[in-house]
């Protein structure tokens, strides 16, 4: 229970204190999108590393050397919990984006960070809109 409280506290404090950082990143994105993406990824990896450690997750990564670094890679996971995202961001070597359910847009600050990290929001109840999201994802991977 203490670990859960620490994780929630860390995430909430990060989201609150990162409000000015989000503004800075939005401005930087207009001038230098690659620098903004790198800084965003670094910050998200940092906080998710803290979340991972606070949660007491032990893990072993195998086969990282087989992931190509010269082209885009699509990872498809069997989503078991939100910790899939924590582990994905903290272990995968290249910039990573996730597809999230559309309802996540309604979570203040978190959704802004998700947009900043190139997450796409999938409307599972509307096949046409869902297909548009998938096609957008394909373009981003190219």
Show which residues each predicted segment covers.
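A transmembrane-helix-recognition feature enriched in membrane-embedded lipid enzymes
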Residues: 1-61, 112-113
């Amino acid at each position: 229970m203490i670990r859960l409280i620490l994780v929630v506290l860390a995430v909430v404090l990060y989201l609150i204190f990162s409000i000015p950082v989000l503004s800075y990143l939005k401005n930087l994105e207009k001038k230098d999108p690659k620098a903004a993406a790198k800084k965003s990824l670094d910050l998200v990896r940092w906080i998710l590393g803290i979340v991972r450690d606070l949660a007491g997750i032990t893990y072993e990564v195998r086969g990282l050397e087989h992931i190509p670094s010269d082209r885009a890679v699509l990872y498809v996971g069997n989503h078991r919990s939100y910790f899939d995202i924590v582990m994905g961001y903290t272990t995968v070597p290249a910039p990573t984006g996730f597809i999230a359910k559309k309802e996540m847009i309604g979570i203040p600050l978190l959704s802004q960070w998700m947009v900043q990290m190139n997450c796409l929001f999938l409307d599972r109840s509307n096949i046409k809109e869902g297909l548009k999201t998938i096609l957008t994802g394909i373009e981003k991977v190219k």
